[in-house]
């Protein structure tokens, strides 16, 4: 029962969550999202703030450029859309920091419109259930996109439920390393299970941290968070 999936959540709240959830677990996002929505409940509120304050409030979510891009997107929404999050995929895609996945996710989850959402969890479910592979390809390709579009229900409401359900199935059940196939509702239809769960063609590698630019940025962000002024 995530707050950004509730019916009463604003379109802006959904947009903020999609920025924060990029490469960051839900449990880390939740408290930061709640604080952001308390401080900046509308794009206009964030747009009026200094960019450095947005970065500082990003906390330990990592990849702080997302905060800068979200701030820039808020300013664009105020200047170009009268302060309202735009409701079409094309308009969303034109905002700073919004790529194809984020635009599709906001279209589906915030506006209830049909859009093909393809994240890592959804790709993994498709790879196993339909293609019989242990893991999807390392990068999204045209064949995967066509498959996702073909599987998507044509009805708008059903398509939104499909996106959310498939994403949740991949996040909670059909996980990368320890899938719990015994409780999976589609295990009897799964091509990967039927094939005997063949090994994936590669092993997922975690991102290194020590000695990287990300570690340096993290240290700098810690200093910035303690500062009283940008």
Where are these regions (language model features)?
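Catalytic cores of DNA base-excision repair glycosylases
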Residues: 1-214, 223-229
């Amino acid at each position: 029962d995530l707050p950004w999936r509730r019916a009463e959540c604003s379109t802006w709240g959904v947009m903020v969550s999609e920025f924060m959830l990029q490469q960051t677990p839900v449990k880390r996002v939740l408290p930061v999202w709640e604080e952001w929505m308390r401080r900046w409940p509308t794009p206009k509120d964030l747009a009026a703030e200094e960019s450095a304050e947005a970065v500082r409030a990003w906390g330990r979510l990592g990849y702080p450029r997302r905060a800068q891009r979200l701030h820039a997107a808020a300013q664009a929404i105020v200047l170009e859309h009268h302060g309202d999050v735009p409701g079409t995929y094309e308009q969303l895609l034109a905002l700073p920091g919004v790529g194809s996945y984020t635009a599709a996710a906001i279209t589906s989850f915030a506006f209830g419109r049909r859009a093909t959402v393809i994240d890592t969890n959804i790709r993994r479910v498709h790879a196993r259930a339909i293609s019989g592979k242990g893991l999807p390809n390392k990068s999204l390709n045209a064949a995967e996109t066509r498959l996702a579009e073909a599987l998507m229900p044509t009805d708008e409401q059903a398509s939104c439920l499909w996106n959310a359900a498939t994403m949740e199935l991949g996040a909670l059940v059909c996980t990368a390393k320890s899938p719990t196939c015994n409780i999976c509702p589609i295990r009897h239809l799964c091509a990967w299970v039927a094939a005997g769960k063949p090994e994936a063609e590669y092993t997922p590698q975690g991102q290194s941290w020590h000695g990287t630019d990300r570690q340096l940025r993290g240290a700098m962000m810690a200093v910035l968070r303690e500062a009283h002024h940008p």
